[in-house]
């Protein structure tokens, strides 16, 4: 193929027209070898003189890109054209390109396409190579080209035997001299010359099967096989769909413009606008317009002959471009083109062949669906063979046409060279004409000059002539000589004039003749110029059109390149995702295809096995019947055995009853075990269901376990503390018991002392002298009693103080209880918040899926647990309150008893002092316990901190539920703070953890039911919120009260400070005398006062801050509620906005995906298919090799089938052996019966063993019962311990009742303390004021001290003066020291008073510290709330950012949509521009479908061979079975025959002994017996004939042709059906013309009339055309072997 052919676009006309005018006489169009008319209709010429394509469709391989790899290897040698042929009109432009020849010849150039070098990466530009191993040159270009796909090498040859100068189709790839450039594949280049390499003389030479050269005319065939599967009438097609019209001229594509009834013929018709002007009308028939189109583009066809084009069908993305889609298209095209081959092959047999009898339909019972499928497959195989022949004929015709095209191109080149010569001649003629014209002008100018001279001379002559007579008259005598001279001169002049005139006339005549000749020449040249100009104009127009088309093509290419670049830019962005999707889909497609292939293979194998098994079943049924009888016998035996077993079962049932009696004791335990087992089974089922959930939950459970372990540690610590407290309580109780015992002993002693007193009284009466002593002793006793009463009063005061302390403790506990209640309320509020958030989470969980539901379920479970824990804490608090009340009551009762006993005796005072010390110890122990509790609370807080860390880490992993988990953490913190007094064991936690996994499954179900309950609970929670607000107000009121109490305390402090200040003023007067010692004490007091003032100020600040924080908390709670409402609203709005945006995004993504899919499809079709089909060709070659291998394997299988016949015979022997084996099996069955009897015995033994095992199990159960009893005993012990603990609890409750009494007293004392606190607060305020005054006084004192220091200096100066006065001073100093000692004693007393004040201050400090703790907790809560606010603000900021991002994304999406719309518009323009290219791509698809069809043919042939093998095997089996049956029948008949012969002989022998009367009867018996014998002989003869026929069938099957690939391979099996006849659907006539050739359709040719039936009857015979030329070397029709060129072209 020449490189001037443009293969890229496929726009160059493959059928150029010859030039109409030929100036050379020899170069006429008649000499051009045209195609011999066989079945090709005459093409209709267009306006430009270009022949239109024939109605017969070119083979689908013309436009294929599959042959691109063999581009440039045609079979013919044609001259290289310098310029391309003129293009066709846009309306009639064909889609075939100039690479058709290479695509057709690719099937015949296997020698030229041999791979010489596999490593193509070694070649470099400038490297010296040998083309084909023979022609040397240098590489000048390596890369992709526009004329063909793939990588090509441009080589500059050493010799001018190339094809071009580096330019192909107007595109320059490199530059070299003409005829030295050539393009070749890299695989055809070598780096060294090949020794035996020669150019093949006939590159297309290859072996091909012989076939007939007679060709029959084509015709339209009306057959059901032409109907494609896609046709469904109006349901399958719609107006505007792209369709294919199948007819005798091939399949023609077009667009469906009309579908419905017409007036020119009944029925539904399809009006199609064809792509090429090969139709009949312009949409109008009989002056009725059905649709509009160009003339010769419209045609009306029945619906049966129209099928949807594959391009119009909406195929799935995963199937487009796949092999299945290509094969389906190929089968559609192949079915559409089978009718012509059948007509062509069977037209010659129409006369000679007798009509085949129609095949009678057999019943459905005789033939299965497999037989029908086999018949259909055979029919399809015939159609495929005919199609192959038709395709080969079409390819040969195309080769001939291509050869004609090449010759026309050579003719065009010659005509172009002639044009150049003519142009040169015209230029020379124009030069000569210009010269002639110039010479003529000069001659005309000279002739005019001469004429003027002649005219002047004539005028002079006339003047002379007129003057001569006067001269003669005047001077005749004087001038005779002059006259003669003048006359001579005149004569001479006249002669000269005549000569000149003659010369001028001759010249004028010559000039006139020359002018006429030149005019004639000019006319002739003008005519030639006009003709040449017309020719040049036509050629220039054609060249302009061609150049414009080339320019347009180049522009289109440029635009294509630009669009490709844009598409590549867009595609590269989407290609990654698309390739990924394609990869996934391709994997799925491959998987599905593999599954389909496996299913097909399995179905085929199952069908073959089913056929074999049906045959085997027929054989085995007889054996089964025999075995059924044996089984019946065995069943009878088994029945007997079963009866025996039933007897044994009765025995075993008796044993079972015994076992049941034994098991009744264990049934309850077994029921419990069964319940537990059922629960375990259910849990296992739930675990099986939640395995996937557990994988995720295991991590969470592990975290929870860690938390649980930490909680265990904390709880163990708390339990240890509680145990210690309990131990301390028990020790206290023991001490109280001891004290009670001591009191009882004391009472006993009192009673004894009273007895002694009575005795003493008796003695006093006897002894009067002892009265005085007794009076004195009584006085002493009275004094002691007074002292004891004083001590008793002191004790009562101490008791009151203790009561006050108890009241303070009770108040503290009440405060703690209130705090716990507030915390519980807060926890409930937090629970409400969590529930609200849970509802939000549920809404989110509907979107988030299982994880959200799991988290919600977890949180719900945790909340339920926390609720239960909170309820437990409340119950425990209530129990503690009741215990405290009971203990207070007990204390009150004890106090009453103590008071009564204190009145009776004074000895109790000492014990009371001891009790005071013990109470102090208990208080110390309690304080230590409080310290321990505080340390443990700190440990709990540390554990909570660790829990917070863990929860934070968990929150990082769970970003979606971070807020909830933080809140849950807060709740857990508060609840862990509340759980300081709880009693919880590790077993409960483990049970909770075990329940947790169960509740996770049930939580999902409960969520739906609880969602309704939550809505009701929300209303309750709102009420509870109102109650909480009231509680907050109450707490505020309590805070105001506390403030008032603080003020009172301050006042009391101020009063005490006033007193102190007064004392200080007194001390100052005394301290003026003292210099140094008093100042230190004052400084200490001042520092203490400053510390107390600072602490008071700090406490006031804390109180104010607490108030502010409470107010801020209120505002924060309200703000958080509002923010939560706003956030929920914004979340709802955002969710709706997000849903809308997601919907829009999904729509835009869908649009983008569609656009990207279209762009990808276009780009991939333009880019990938060109390369992909090349690879497919390689794969086809590989597959062909594989198929050849398979054919060889199938031949071997056929040989194996022949061997299988021998194996069948051997199997017959083996079947006999099987019979013996069956007999042996019968014996084995009998043996097995014996074995079963033995088994029955073994079963009996096993039953016995099982009974022993059951007994062993019973023993085990007894042991387990013992263990259970031990456990029950342990449980009883635990119950006893619990009872004891309950008793202890009761005791504690009683003590609590006593304590409650004490609490009441303490509460009363607490009221007094509150009053005192109010007073103290007032004192504190007064003290603050006094402190300010004291500070001013201290400043003054400091000033006085300075003055005193100055005085001391002065006194030191005056020491020398005062030495004399030192003695007096020493005396004064001694006096002062005495006074100082007194002052020290007073100071000690004051210090004691100060210590008491410090104790009170310490108590107030403890109260303040508790308040500080509560304030700290409030601060922590505030900080947490602030953190929540921050998180909410961050979330709101994040949401705002997300909104802004979404807005930006929306704007970007809108911009991208606008860009995409612009791109879509450009794409539409691009689609309009690519319409013709898509046609070429469609032809490429058709070619690929052809290749796939070839593969299908090979697969079908393989399947045919396999079916043939199966048929042969089936036939062999059936023949073998029939022979078996026949042999059996023959044996039975022979037995009957022998029996009848014996009976006849016996009758003959008996006839001889009978009398003559019975001769007639005997003759009748003989006749009947002879008739029977004849009948039996006839039956035997029929059976033998059938046997012979079956043997003949077997022999024919054995002698089948081994090569089923030949076209006549199946002629031995079935006869060819007669070819279908021509039929016109409009005229409703046979054998006249096709529907598409009906003259009624033609809108222009209305002169046609419907042919009559007589003409049909008379003109049934059709003449055959003359045989076509055929090339043996090329194996192609269209040229003879002698005309074939031998050189190889590229």
From Swiss-Prot:
Q: Modified residue Phosphoserine is at which positions? A: 64, 67, 216, 309, 322, 325, 328, 1682
Cite the InterPro entries for this sequence.
Answer: CAP-Gly_dom_sf, CAP-Gly_domain, CLIP1_ZNF
Q: How does it assemble?
A: Interacts with Lva.
**Entry-linked Gene3D superfamilies:** 1.10.287.1490, CAP Gly-rich-like domain
Question: Gene deleted: what happens?
Answer: RNAi-mediated knockdown has no effect on nuclear positioning in fat body cells.
- For bias kind Basic and acidic residues, which ranges apply? 1040-1052, 1410-1419
What is this protein called in UniProt? Restin homolog
Q: In which tissues is it expressed?
A: Specifically expressed at the tip of the furrow in cellularizing blastoderms. CLIP-190 and jar are coexpressed at several times in development and in a number of tissues, including embryonic axonal neuron processes and posterior pole.
Sections of the chain in a coiled coil: 378-468, 484-660, 667-916, 926-981, 1001-1121, 1158-1549, 1565-1600
Pfam families listed in its UniProt record: CAP_GLY (PF01302), CLIP1_ZNF (PF16641)
- Tell me where it resides: Cytoplasm; Cytoplasm, Cytoskeleton; Golgi apparatus; Cytoplasm, Cytoskeleton, Microtubule organizing center
Source taxon at top rank: Eukaryota
């Amino acid at each position: 193929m020449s490189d001037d052919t443009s293969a890229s676009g496929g726009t160059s006309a493959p059928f150029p027209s010859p030039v109409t005018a030929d100036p050379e006489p020899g170069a006429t169009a008649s000499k051009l070898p045209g195609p011999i008319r066989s079945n090709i209709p005459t093409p209709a010429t267009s306006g430009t003189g270009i022949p239109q394509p024939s109605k017969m469709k070119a083979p689908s391989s013309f436009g294929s890109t599959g042959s691109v790899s063999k581009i440039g290897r045609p079979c013919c040698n044609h001259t290289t054209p310098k310029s391309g042929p003129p293009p066709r009109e846009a309306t009639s432009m064909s889609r075939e390109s100039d690479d058709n020849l290479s695509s057709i010849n690719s099937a015949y150039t296997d020698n030229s396409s041999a791979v010489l070098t596999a490593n193509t990466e070694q070649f470099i530009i400038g490297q010296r190579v040998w083309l084909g191993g023979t022609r040397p040159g240098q590489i000048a270009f390596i890369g992709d080209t526009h004329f063909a796909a793939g990588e090509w090498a441009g080589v500059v040859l050493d010799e001018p035997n190339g094809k071009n100068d580096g330019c192909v189709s107007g595109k320059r790839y490199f530059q070299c001299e003409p005829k030295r450039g050539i393009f070749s594949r890299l695989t055809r280049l070598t780096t060294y010359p090949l020794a035996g390499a020669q150019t093949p003389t006939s590159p297309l030479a290859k072996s091909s099967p012989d076939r007939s050269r007679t060709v029959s005319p084509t015709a339209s065939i009306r057959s059901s096989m032409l109907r494609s599967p896609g046709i469904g009438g109006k349901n399958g097609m719609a107006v505007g769909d792209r369709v294919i019209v199948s007819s005798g001229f091939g399949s023609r594509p077009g667009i469906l413009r009309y579908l419905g009834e017409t007036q020119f013929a009944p029925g539904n018709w399809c009006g199609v606008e064809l792509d090429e002007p090969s139709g009949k009308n312009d949409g109008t028939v009989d002056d009725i317009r059905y649709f509009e189109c160009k003339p010769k583009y419209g045609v009306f066809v029945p619906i049966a002959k129209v099928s949807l084009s594959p391009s119009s069908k909406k195929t799935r993305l995963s199937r487009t471009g796949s092999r299945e889609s290509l094969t389906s298209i190929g089968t559609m095209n192949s079915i559409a083109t089978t009718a012509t081959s059948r007509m062509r092959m069977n037209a010659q047999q129409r006369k000679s062949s007798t009509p085949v009898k129609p095949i009678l339909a057999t019943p459905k019972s005789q033939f299965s669906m497999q037989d029908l499928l086999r018949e259909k497959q055979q029919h399809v195989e015939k159609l495929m063979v005919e199609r192959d022949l038709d395709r080969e004929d079409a390819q040969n015709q195309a080769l001939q046409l291509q050869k004609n095209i090449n010759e026309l191109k050579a003719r065009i080149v010659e005509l172009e060279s002639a044009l150049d010569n003519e142009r040169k001649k015209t230029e020379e003629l124009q030069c000569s004409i210009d010269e002639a014209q110039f010479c003529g002008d000069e001659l005309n100018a000279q002739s005019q000059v001469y004429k003027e001279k002649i005219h002047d001379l004539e005028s002079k002559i006339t003047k002379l002539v007129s003057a001569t007579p006067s001269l003669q008259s005047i001077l005749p005598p004087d001038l005779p000589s002059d006259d003669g001279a003048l006359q001579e001169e005149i004569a001479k002049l006249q002669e000269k004039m005549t000569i000149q005139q003659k010369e001028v006339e001759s010249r004028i005549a010559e000039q006139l003749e020359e002018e006429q000749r030149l005019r004639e020449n000019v006319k002739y040249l003008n005519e030639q110029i006009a003709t040449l100009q017309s020719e040049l104009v036509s050629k220039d127009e054609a060249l302009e059109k061609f150049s414009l088309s080339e320019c347009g093509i180049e522009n289109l290419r440029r635009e294509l390149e630009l669009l490709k670049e844009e598409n590549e830019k867009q595609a590269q962005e989407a290609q990654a995702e698309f390739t990924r999707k394609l990869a996934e889909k391709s994997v799925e497609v491959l998987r599905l295809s593999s599954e389909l292939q496996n299913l097909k293979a399995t179905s085929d194998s199952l069908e073959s096995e089913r056929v074999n098994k049906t045959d085997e079943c027929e054989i085995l049924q007889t054996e089964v019947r025999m075995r059924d009888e044996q089984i019946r016998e065995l069943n009878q035996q088994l029945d007997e055995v079963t009866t025996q077993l039933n007897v044994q079962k009765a025995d075993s049932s008796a044993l079972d009853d015994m076992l049941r009696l034994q098991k009744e004791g264990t049934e309850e335990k077994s029921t419990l075990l069964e319940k537990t087992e059922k629960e375990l089974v259910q849990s296992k089922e739930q675990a099986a269901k939640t395995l996937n959930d557990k994988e995720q939950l295991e991590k969470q459970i592990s975290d929870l376990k860690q938390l649980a372990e930490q909680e265990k540690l904390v709880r163990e610590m708390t339990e240890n503390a509680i145990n210690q407290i309990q131990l301390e309580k028990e020790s206290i109780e023991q001490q109280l018991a001891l004290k009670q015992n001591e009191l009882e002993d004391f009472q006993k002693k009192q009673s004894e002392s009273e007895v002694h007193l009575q005795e003493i009284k008796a003695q006093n009466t006897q002894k009067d002298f002892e009265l005085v002593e007794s009076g004195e002793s009584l006085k002493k006793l009275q004094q002691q009693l007074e002292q004891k009463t004083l001590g008793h009063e002191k004790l009562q005061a101490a008791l009151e103080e203790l009561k006050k302390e108890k009241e303070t403790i009770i108040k503290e506990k009440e405060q703690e209880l209130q705090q716990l209640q507030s915390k519980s309320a807060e926890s409930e509020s937090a629970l409400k918040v969590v529930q609200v958030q849970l509802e939000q989470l549920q809404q989110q969980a509907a979107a988030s899926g299982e994880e959200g539901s799991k988290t919600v379920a977890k949180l719900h479970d945790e909340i339920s647990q926390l609720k239960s824990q909170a309820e437990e804490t409340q119950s425990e608090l209530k129990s503690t309150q009741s215990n405290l009340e009971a203990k207070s009551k007990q204390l009150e009762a004890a106090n009453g008893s103590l008071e009564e006993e204190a009145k009776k005796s004074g000895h109790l005072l000492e014990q009371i002092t001891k009790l005071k010390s013990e109470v102090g110890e208990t208080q110390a122990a309690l304080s230590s316990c409080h310290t321990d509790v505080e340390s443990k609370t700190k440990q709990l807080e540390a554990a909570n901190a660790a829990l917070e860390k863990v929860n934070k880490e968990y929150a990082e992993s769970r970003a979606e539920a971070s807020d909830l988990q933080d809140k849950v953490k807060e709740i857990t913190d508060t609840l862990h703070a509340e759980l300081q007094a709880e009693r919880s064991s590790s077993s409960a936690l483990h049970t909770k953890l075990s329940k947790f996994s169960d509740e996770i499954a049930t939580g999902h179900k409960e969520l739906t039911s609880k969602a309704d309950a939550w809505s009701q609970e929300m209303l309750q929670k709102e009420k509870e919120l109102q109650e909480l607000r009231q509680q907050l107000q109450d707490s505020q009121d309590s805070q105001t009260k506390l403030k008032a109490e603080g003020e009172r305390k301050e006042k009391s402090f101020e009063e005490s400070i006033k007193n102190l200040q007064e004392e200080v003023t007194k001390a100052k007067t005394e301290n003026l005398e003292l210099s140094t010692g008093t100042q230190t004490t004052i400084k200490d007091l001042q520092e203490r006062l400053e510390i107390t003032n600072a602490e008071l100020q700090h406490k006031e600040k804390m109180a104010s801050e607490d108030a502010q924080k409470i107010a801020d908390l209120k505002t924060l709670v309200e703000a958080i509620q509002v923010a939560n409402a706003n956030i929920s609203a914004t979340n709802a709005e955002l969710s709706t906005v997000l849903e809308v945006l997601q919907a829009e995004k999904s729509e835009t993504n869908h649009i983008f995906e569609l656009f990207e899919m279209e762009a990808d499809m276009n780009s991939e079709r333009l880019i990938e298919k060109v390369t992909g089909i090349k690879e497919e060709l390689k794969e086809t070659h590989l597959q062909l090799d594989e198929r050849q291998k398979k054919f060889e394997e199938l031949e071997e299988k056929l040989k194996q089938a022949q061997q299988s016949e021998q194996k069948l015979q051997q199997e017959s022997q083996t079947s006999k052996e099987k019979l013996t084996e069956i007999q042996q099996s019968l014996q084995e069955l009998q043996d097995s019966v014996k074995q079963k009897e033995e088994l029955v015995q073994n079963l009996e033994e096993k039953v016995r063993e099982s009974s022993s095992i059951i007994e062993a199990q019973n023993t085990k159960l007894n042991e387990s019962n013992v263990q259970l009893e031990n456990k029950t005993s342990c449980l009883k012990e635990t119950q006893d311990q619990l009872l004891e603990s309950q008793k202890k609890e009761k005791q504690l409750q009683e003590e609590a009742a006593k304590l409650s009494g004490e609490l009441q007293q303490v509460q009363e004392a607490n009221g007094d303390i509150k009053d005192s606190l109010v007073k103290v607060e007032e004192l504190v305020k007064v003290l603050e004021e006094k402190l300010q005054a004291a500070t001013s006084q201290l400043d003054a004192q400091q000033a006085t001290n300075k003055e005193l220091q100055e005085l001391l200096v002065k006194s030191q100066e005056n020491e020398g003066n005062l030495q004399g006065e030192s003695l007096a001073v020493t005396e004064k100093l001694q006096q002062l020291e005495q006074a100082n000692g007194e002052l020290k004693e007073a100071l000690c007393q004051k210090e004691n008073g100060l210590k008491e004040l410090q104790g009170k201050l310490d108590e107030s400090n403890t109260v303040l510290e508790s308040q500080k703790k509560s304030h700290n907790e409030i601060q922590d809560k505030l900080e947490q709330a602030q953190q929540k606010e921050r998180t909410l603000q961050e979330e709101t900021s994040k949401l705002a950012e997300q909104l802004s991002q979404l807005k930006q994304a929306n704007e970007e999406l809108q911009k991208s949509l606008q860009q995409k719309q612009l791109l879509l518009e450009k794409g539409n323009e691009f689609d309009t521009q690519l319409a013709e290219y898509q046609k070429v791509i469609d032809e490429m698809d058709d070619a690929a479908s052809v290749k796939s069809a070839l593969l299908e043919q090979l697969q079908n042939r393989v399947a045919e061979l396999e079916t043939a093998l199966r048929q042969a095997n089936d036939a062999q089996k059936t023949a073998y079975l029939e022979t078996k049956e026949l042999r059996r029948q023959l044996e039975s008949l022979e037995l009957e025959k022998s029996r009848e012969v014996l009976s006849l002989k016996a009758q003959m022998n008996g006839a001889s002994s009978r009398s003559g009367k019975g001769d007639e009867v005997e003759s009748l018996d003989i006749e009947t017996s002879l008739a029977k014998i004849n009948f039996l002989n006839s039956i035997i003869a029929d059976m033998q004939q059938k046997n012979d026929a079956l043997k003949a069938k077997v022999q024919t099957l054995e002698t089948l042709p081994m090569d089923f690939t030949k076209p006549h391979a199946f002629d031995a099996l079935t006869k060819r059906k007669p070819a279908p006849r021509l039929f016109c659907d409009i005229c409703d006539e046979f054998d006249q013309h096709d529907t598409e050739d009906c003259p009624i359709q033609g809108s222009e040719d209305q002169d046609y009339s419907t042919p009559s039936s007589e003409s049909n009857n008379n003109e049934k015979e059709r003449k055959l055309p003359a045989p076509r030329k055929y090339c043996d070397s090329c194996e192609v029709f269209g040229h003879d072997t002698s005309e074939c060129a031998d050189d190889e072209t590229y």
